[in-house]
Amino acid sequence: MASLAKDPDKRPHSLSEISASCHLPLTFLEQIAFDLRKSQLLSAQRGRNGGYLLTRRPEMISLVEILEVLEGPLKTVPCQDSQCSLSDCATRGFWEVLQRHLHKTLQRITLADLVSKNPRKLLPLVP
């Protein structure tokens, strides 16, 4: 997605092209592209000049959206959504607060921020 976001021409890119430029295995990209298309973060154009495109501007795609498509809901501990097996878990409150802060921070970081030529731009986003 970063490769597509950095393209000034906003033209479709094939997975083979992205694989070569990012040094990632094609089969890995095929799996990721399938999930990103299913979640409507990417679209595909068929044909000779076809390839993949972002469905929204990079400024409108948050890092948390991408991560949750690829990894599932973000959880700091496995028992986050269920009853803890410990009757009196001393750290559950800490993990819940950390989870909220992590989600909020990743929600504010966009794909455009990630590909920005100025990484210092991200520093104000992290409390």
Identify the residue ranges that each predicted region occupies.
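Beta-hairpin "wing" of winged helix-turn-helix
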Residues: 41-54
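Conserved segment of winged-helix/HTH DNA-binding domains
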Residues: 58-81, 99-101
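C-terminal regulatory/oligomerization modules of transcriptional regulators
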Residues: 82-127
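N-terminal helix-turn-helix DNA-binding core of bacterial DNA-binding proteins
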Residues: 1-25
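Short linear capping/connector segments at secondary-structure termini
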Residues: 14-17, 47-49, 79-86, 119-120
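Basic amphipathic alpha-helical segments that dock to polyanions
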Residues: 32-39
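Residues in the helix-turn-helix
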Residues: 28
